């Protein structure tokens, strides 16, 4: 027997074909959401309050400080918030201190700052009763970037850009004449020396001393027509603020506010880290030749001689000195922007790699302290110097698409940015109120207006592009949605502008972003998925785990290092499937490694790291595809995406051929019930599980608290699928922490179960499986194999109208008792009733306009006080295709204290469940991108059958395999058949699964032919087919594209107001468009009357269509068509342009256009046809 048996969760064993012992288990898969939000609650909020605190008024007399904050308890729990359509949130209270400097008076108060949405345990938010997910955003990291392009003369030019988190951009560029220019915040370019003079390097000599004698600088100085700091400041001011009178003071304050004011310019900690890393000397001296001797000033020790090449060993020796003392200079400036502060730089001379003997200055920014979140003059000087070094081939340009230069903004940071907007608006209000109100009576509460804060949060959760309605089709869809990375959204890219490079797979994605899972269509490559082992570091960069290789001994250690993309670029990384001996050494002398984007073969003592697992490359959804290594990438992409669309079935079944990921995916998705503490099961019902905790005290087990886990029963998901949990433990079972005790939708025995295992034959059958169509056995319908439950929600509200309140009642005018048989005394349908299209769900009447009463009615009214009830029926009815069984009714009223929108007195929600069996036109798919539509459901006895007499359940077309190159499905077919016959479940992990030989061996073990083929017999004749056929067991999914949701038919219905043509689409109950090409077809056949009918009475001849309807109902002949409405519209259009247009007949007589006559309108109303753009039966 090949493979070994492993435990997949508590309830199932699988035989795995894996050969690699994984040293690291999978992390918590929704950690990216939870960690980020936790950071926000613990630190993000505090940072925000520190940023705006203290707020002072314009005189500096009143000071408002934020001291501390706390979150209270939420008003409703998660389930109740969903039920009541409210936001799951907790009140945020902030401790505020107001100081009056004149009187020395201090007032402290706790101020309520609005309800703050909380994250649920599963990483979602509940906003107005709907579950939403905040998707992480991939953006360019703030830093300094260098780029190169070739101009039209074939000359290489460079550009540099300093990108902050928020604030003005600073760009450097060269032109054809070798002059260096700078742009401040996308304005016109000025010579870079003007900016240097403004920083305080007034004279040419100072600039040349600072940057070295360089021809580029000399060219720039020639171009520069300023000669002092003052002139430079005025020049810059005129560029940034044209038309305003320039003064030196204004210019200084403008530059300070643009770049050196922390409130206006923010690099964020990540920007400071990236900037220091890029400009630090240790990265810039690597592989360069020194032009000076490096000596330790304190001890006189020589680190490196002049003329020495700095390789990695020398670099490691001098790094501590670079951090400490070598090369530091303080430059004094005069009259610059920051007055006379010294600029702290670090400078070392090297030889030019391209011109012999030329000395180049390398200037670092002197390791600016991490607390400086704004740019400093040292940064600017150092960035300009790096740019000049590039012109002499020292340094490197940056790749924007490298994941070392793109970072993630997760929930916490996105929320923080939004909260910052709200707080800054609030700060403005506070300042205004401080100056207006009486300073003695003032309190913190009176100053603070929390409206802008609440509004900005509401806006973010309600309408931001990154706050999305959770995809809840199945557990995998939920999980993937929380791990999604989007490059779109505010501050990101747009679909139209994103080019090819951004979307492409990059070598730095390895182990960080999945190269497979991304949508097809306009968003391809812009929306990605996090790889299975990846995590996010404090700066927002994606890290992936690696096993360290000990450089001395060559042992692969079990301790794990997490590396970001730019850290990894300098190392040789071996694959996870490199064979190791018992001690953990590489078996082979030469090991295949990756370094940047290249695949190299290196000696085993040169390997730095090794992958932890073969599946660390791919995302969770892709890691669920068995034999992924045998599939073409395009089809694997479809497979990953279609697993997310699988509908939860009535009776789910885990796959016989899995990848070993099924348990982890189910556990972390949040749909299964996971034990929080170890203990023993005390009670199990369909609705709850009780587990008694036990603690060990002095070696004895002592009973502790009781944990109660409630099951969700038949609840509607966001996508209308059914959420239903059921227990899978029995009374008396011992439970460990993390065990799955209850299955949710699409899980079975604690494993993800998106579809069913079915017997499939690959053969053609009478053309019924031509072009990917699927032939199905009726047995799958009879046995409810692919039956799913769908729940739809309908609501009706009783409002206050101008003519009086609407009323929910059983007493509806002109409705017979038969139609009311399922309503209770309130007029609301009872739970459990079976209903058809058009049945009443909630009886409701609305007052009609008051009419003049006749004398008799007035008399009756005077005697009985009862006016003839003037109401019309506005009941909620079941729409087309909505029939099913009522599973739940919820009634909310003002009297019960429910929060309802203004003007609404009563709200009724009705939930209808439908059992949908699989039917012709439904879409099905395997896990390898092999999708198709059901073409025919055939009687079981007519299906081809196996030698033992059992019929196959599905017949697929073998032509769907070779051209698509997804051979994984064939291997799955073989292995699945063997597993079914052996009665086992198998696991074949991605890139480390069963080899071809092992599949054949398992087939033989099960007593099947090694080629997996068998003789099949025709079910209709009993004759064997000519050739042996591949038959096996495949895991097939039923996808959310169900024919019941798409099928649609219309007789009459709503018409568009202007053109009077039928509306389009199922949602509007529209008609089918008879388009240009269809008209040509009728013309080609010469079907004149059919064509006339289609263009007139079936479309927009208003009078004609009413008459036609009447004629059909009365059984008369259909009348002559009139003039179509759209023709009248055309004439009106021409008349509106001032043309006199008439219609003439063949003998030049003017034709009067017949308008709708009164009698016709009456007829239309009789026939229940609404002509004025309203819809049928709408009122």
From Swiss-Prot:
Coiled-coil regions listed in the entry: none
One Pfam family cited in the UniProt record for this chain: RNA_pol_Rpb2_1
Molecular function per GO: DNA binding; DNA-directed RNA polymerase activity; ribonucleoside binding
UniProt key word Hydrolase: no
Cellular component GO terms held in the UniProt record: DNA-directed RNA polymerase complex
GO biological process, one term: DNA-templated transcription
Transcription in keyword set: yes
EC number: 2.7.7.6
Acidic residues bias: start-end ranges: 1153-1162
Enzyme class: transferase
Keyword list, A-Z: DNA-directed RNA polymerase, Nucleotidyltransferase, Transcription, Transferase
Catalytic activity: RNA(n) + a ribonucleoside 5'-triphosphate = RNA(n+1) + diphosphate
Region (Disordered): 1153-1179
Function: DNA-dependent RNA polymerase catalyzes the transcription of DNA into RNA using the four ribonucleoside triphosphates as substrates.
Complexes and interactors: The RNAP catalytic core consists of 2 alpha, 1 beta, 1 beta' and 1 omega subunit. When a sigma factor is associated with the core the holoenzyme is formed, which can initiate transcription.
Protein family per UniProt: Belongs to the RNA polymerase beta chain family.
Protein name as catalogued: DNA-directed RNA polymerase subunit beta
Organism: Brevibacillus brevis (strain 47 / JCM 6285 / NBRC 100599)
UniProt lineage: Bacteria, Bacillati, Bacillota, Bacilli, Bacillales
Gene behind this protein: rpoB
């Amino acid at each position: 027997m090949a493979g070994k048996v492993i435990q997949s969760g508590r309830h199932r064993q699988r035989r795995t074909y894996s050969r690699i012992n994984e040293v690291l288990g999978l992390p918590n898969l929704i950690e990216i959401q939870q960690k980020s939000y936790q950071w926000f609650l613990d630190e993000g909020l505090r940072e925000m309050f520190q940023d705006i605190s203290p707020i002072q008024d314009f005189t500096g007399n009143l000071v408002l400080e934020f001291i501390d904050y706390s979150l209270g308890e939420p008003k409703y729990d998660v389930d109740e918030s969903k039920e009541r359509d409210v936001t799951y949130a907790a009140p945020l209270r902030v401790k505020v201190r107001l100081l009056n400097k004149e009187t020395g008076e201090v007032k402290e108060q706790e101020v309520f700052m609005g309800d703050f949405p909380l994250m649920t345990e599963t990483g979602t938010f509940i906003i107005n009763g709907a579950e939403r997910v905040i998707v992480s955003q991939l953006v360019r990291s703030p830093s300094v970037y260098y780029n190169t392009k070739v101009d039209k003369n074939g000359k290489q030019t460079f550009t540099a850009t300093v990108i902050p988190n928020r604030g003005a951009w600073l760009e450097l560029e060269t032109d054809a004449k070798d002059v260096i220019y700078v742009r401040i915040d996308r304005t016109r370019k000025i010579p870079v020396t003007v900016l240097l003079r403004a920083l305080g390097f007034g004279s040419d000599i100072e600039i040349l001393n600072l940057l070295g004698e360089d021809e580029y600088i000399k060219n720039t100085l020639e171009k520069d027509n300023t000669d002092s700091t003052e002139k430079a400041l005025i020049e810059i001011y005129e560029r940034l603020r044209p038309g305003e009178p320039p003064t030196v003071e204004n210019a200084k304050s403008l530059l300070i506010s643009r770049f050196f004011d922390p409130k206006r310019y923010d690099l964020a900690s990540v920007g400071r880290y990236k900037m220091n890393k890029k400009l630090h000397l240790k990265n810039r001296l690597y592989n360069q030749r020194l032009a000076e001797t490096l000596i330790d000033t304190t001890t006189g020790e020589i680190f490196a001689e002049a003329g020495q090449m700095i390789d990695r060993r020398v670099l490691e020796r001098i790094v501590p000195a670079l951090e400490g003392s070598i090369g530091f200079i303080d430059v004094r400036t005069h009259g610059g922007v920051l007055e006379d502060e010294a600029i702290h730089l670090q400078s070392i001379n090297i030889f030019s790699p391209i011109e012999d003997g030329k000395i180049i200055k390398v200037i670092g920014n002197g390791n600016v302290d991490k607390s400086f979140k704004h740019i400093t003059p040292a940064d600017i000087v150092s960035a300009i110097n790096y740019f000049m070094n590039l012109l002499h081939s020292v340094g490197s340009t940056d790749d924007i698409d490298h994941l070392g230069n793109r970072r993630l903004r997760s929930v916490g940071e996105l929320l923080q940015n939004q909260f910052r907007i709200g707080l800054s608006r609030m700060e403005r209000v506070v300042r205004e109120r401080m100056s207006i109100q009486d300073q003695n009576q003032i309190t913190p509460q009176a100053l603070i207006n929390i409206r802008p804060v609440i509004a900005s949060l509401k806006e973010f959760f309600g309408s931001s592009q990154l706050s999305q309605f959770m995809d809840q089709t199945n557990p995998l869809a939920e999980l993937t949605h929380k791990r999604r990375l989007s490059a779109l959204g505010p501050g990101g890219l747009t679909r139209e502008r994103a080019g090819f490079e951004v979307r492409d797979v990059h070598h730095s994605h390895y182990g960080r972003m999945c190269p497979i899972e991304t949508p097809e269509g306009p968003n391809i490559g812009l929306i990605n998925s996090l790889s299975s082992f990846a995590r996010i570091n404090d700066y927002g960069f994606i890290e992936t785990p690696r096993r360290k290789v000990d450089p001395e001994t060559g042992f692969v250690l079990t301790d794990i290092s997490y590396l970001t993309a730019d850290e990894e670029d300098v190392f040789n990384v071996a694959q996870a499937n490199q064979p190791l001996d018992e001690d953990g050494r590489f078996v082979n002398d030469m090991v295949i490694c990756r370094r940047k984007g290249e695949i190299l073969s290196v000696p085993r003592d040169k390997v730095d790291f090794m992958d932890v697992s073969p599946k660390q490359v791919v995302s969770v959804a892709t890691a669920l595809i068995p034999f992924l290594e045998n599939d073409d990438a395009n089809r694997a992409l479809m497979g990953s995406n279609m697993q997310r669309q699988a509908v939860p079935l009535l009776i789910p079944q885990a796959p016989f051929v899995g990848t070993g990921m099924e348990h982890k995916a189910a556990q972390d998705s949040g749909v299964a019930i996971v034990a929080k503490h170890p203990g023993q099961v005390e009670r199990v019902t369909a609705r709850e599980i009780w587990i008694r905790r036990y603690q060990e005290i002095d070696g004895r087990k002592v009973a502790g608290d009781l944990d109660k886990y409630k099951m969700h029963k038949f609840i509607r998901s966001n996508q209308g699928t059914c959420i239903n949990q059921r227990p899978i433990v029995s009374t008396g079972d011992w439970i460990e922490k993390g065990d799955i005790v209850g299955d949710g939708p699409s899980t079975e025995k604690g494993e993800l179960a998106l579809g069913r295992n079915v017997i499939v034959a690959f053969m053609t059958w009478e053309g019924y499986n031509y072009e990917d169509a699927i032939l199905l056995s009726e047995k799958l319908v009879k046995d409810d194999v692919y039956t799913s439950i769908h729940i739809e929600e309908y609501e009706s509200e009783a409002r206050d109208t101008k003519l009086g309140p609407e009323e929910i009642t059983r007493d509806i005018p002109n409705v017979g008792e038969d139609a009311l048989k399922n309503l209770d005394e309130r007029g609301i349908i009872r739970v459990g009733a079976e209903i058809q299209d058009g049945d009443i769900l909630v009886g409701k009447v609305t007052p009609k306009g008051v009419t003049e009463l006749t004398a008799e009615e007035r008399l009756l009214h005077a005697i009985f006080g009862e006016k003839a009830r003037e109401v019309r029926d506005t009941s909620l009815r079941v729409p087309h295709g909505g029939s099913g069984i009522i599973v739940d009714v919820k009634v909310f009223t003002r009297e019960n204290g429910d929060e309802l929108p203004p003007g609404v007195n009563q709200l009724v929600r009705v939930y209808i469940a439908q059992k949908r069996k699989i039917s012709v036109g439904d879409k099905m798919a395997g896990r390898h991108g092999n999708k198709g539509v059901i073409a025919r459901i055939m009687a079981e006895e007519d299906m081809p059958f196996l030698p033992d007499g059992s019929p196959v359940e599905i017949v697929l077309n073998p032509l769907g395999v070779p051209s698509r190159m997804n051979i994984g499905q064939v291997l799955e077919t073989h292995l699945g058949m063997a597993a079914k016959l052996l009665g086992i479940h198998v696991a074949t992990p991605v890139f480390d699964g069963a080899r071809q030989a092992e599949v054949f061996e398992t087939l033989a073990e099960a007593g099947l032919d090694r080629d997996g083929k068998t003789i099949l017999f025709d079910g209709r004749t009993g004759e064997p087919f000519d050739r042996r056929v591949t038959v096996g067991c495949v895991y097939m999914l039923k996808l959310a594209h169900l024919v019941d949701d798409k099928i649609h038919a219309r007789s009459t219905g709503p018409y568009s107001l202007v053109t009077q043509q039928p509306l389009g689409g199922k949602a509007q109950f529209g008609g089918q468009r008879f388009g240009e090409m269809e008209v040509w077809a009728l013309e080609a056949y010469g079907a004149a009357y059919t064509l006339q009918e289609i263009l007139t009475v079936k479309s927009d001849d208003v009078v004609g269509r009413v008459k036609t309807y009447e004629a059909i109902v009365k059984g008369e002949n259909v009348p002559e068509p009139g003039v179509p409405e759209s023709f009248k519209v055309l004439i009106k259009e021409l008349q509106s342009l001032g043309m006199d247009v008439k219609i003439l007949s063949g003998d030049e007589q003017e034709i009067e256009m017949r308008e709708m006559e009164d009698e016709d309108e009456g007829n239309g109303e009789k026939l229940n046809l609404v002509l004025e753009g309203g819809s049928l039966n709408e009122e």
